[in-house]
Amino acid sequence: IELIICCTVTPDMVFPATANVIAHKCGIKHGFGFDINAGCSGFLYGLTTAAKYVEAGFVKRAIVVGAEKMSAITNYEDRATCPIFGDGAAAVLLEATEEPYGLMDEVLYSDGEGVKHLHQVAGGSVKPASHETVDAREHFIYQEGQAVFKWAVVKMAEATEEIMRRNNLTSNDIAFLLPHQANLRIIKATGSRLELDPEKVLINIEKYGNTTSATIPMLM
């Protein structure tokens, strides 16, 4: 293993990278690793990044981890967030091959304007941890659920529609959709917009909740 990418918003500590902790515990000494902090999109960014390293011939094998301990940043007195999030982890191995399959394409979006709707107020360099921030519960997740719901339904469907259009695919060509497990309403609304049969849309949120960066690899 020459590369480990850990996708997480709940790292063990600010530094070193959790990927390096994983490498050490797995006895991997002759590679490199780094973390990607990109919220619910993190695993897709990590998968794409690792694939590019492999495709370029820079590494032969890479591991992408999605791991979260959302319970560490969830306020269990906040009914808007505490029923939603869960803890979990999963990993995938990518390696070079001559076989005619693999990652066909990717569509990635980010929109910094939405930061006000979903964030963690304190704990970073803008607002370091203090007695005041702890007392104000500013180290927990803050989410405006309705705003996030509207954006997620539109953008998840748009990204899927774009990648299908670019590759001349229809809903009949799709064996399974592995969506981020944000919540059941978002998943079902996205599947409906894409005109996919419900049995093609994989769901495990009822078991694990929203594990942020870990949802997609856990579905795999």
Residue spans for each PLM region:
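Condensing-enzyme catalytic core mediating Claisen C-C bond formation in acyl metabolism
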Residues: 78-150, 154, 158
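Claisen-condensing/thiolase-fold acyl-transfer catalytic domains that form or cleave C-C bonds
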Residues: 10-11, 24, 28-30, 38-58, ...
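Flexible, glycine-rich active-site loops centered on histidine and acidic residues
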Residues: 55-89
